[in-house]
């Protein structure tokens, strides 16, 4: 699963997921899966969506993952009293804003790409839409 190789600090504040998305256009492939809302995508969810897509296109074409989980989420163990410091890092998330392109695909027909993205979207906790590359 995806996670940073090294970070400056082990743990991070919770923070807020506000603002506008960067990376709202299809850059690498022909088709894309764009987020319609805000969420935190875990590394497991990204991997599950990637597997669903690659199986649907039968390993033809190319898939780009445009998000990376770089925020550590900590949890305290079960039945532990409050206090005594921050919990251990349990998993990594990527903060998603509306309009962010999550995945891109090229080298497959549009119908195949739509079907693959539909399967991938079922694994994600946010509403998504299918987008195509616009040539200026």
UniProtKB/Swiss-Prot annotation:
Assembly and interaction partners: Part of the 50S ribosomal subunit.
CDD domains recorded: Ribosomal_L16_L10e
Family: Belongs to the universal ribosomal protein uL16 family.
Protein name in UniProt: Large ribosomal subunit protein uL16
HAMAP family linked: Ribosomal_uL16 (MF_01342)
SUPFAM superfamilies xrefs: Ribosomal protein L16p/L10e (SSF54686)
Record organism: Yersinia pestis
GO cellular component: cytosolic large ribosomal subunit
């Amino acid at each position: 699963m995806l996670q940073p190789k090294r970070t400056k600090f082990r743990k991070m504040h919770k923070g807020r997921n506000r603002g506008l998305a960067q990376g709202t256009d299809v850059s690498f492939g022909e088709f894309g899966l764009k987020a319609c809302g805000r969420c935190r995508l875990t590394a497991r969810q990204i991997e599950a969506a990637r597997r669903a897509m690659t199986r649907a296109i039968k390993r033809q074409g190319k898939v780009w993952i445009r998000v990376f989980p770089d925020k550590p989420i900590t949890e305290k163990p079960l039945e532990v009293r409050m206090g005594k410091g921050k919990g251990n890092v349990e998993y990594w998330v990527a903060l998603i804003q509306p309009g962010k392109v999550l995945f891109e695909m090229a080298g497959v027909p549009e119908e195949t790409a739509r079907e693959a993205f539909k399967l991938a979207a079922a694994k994600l906790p946010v509403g998504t839409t299918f987008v195509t590359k616009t040539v200026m």
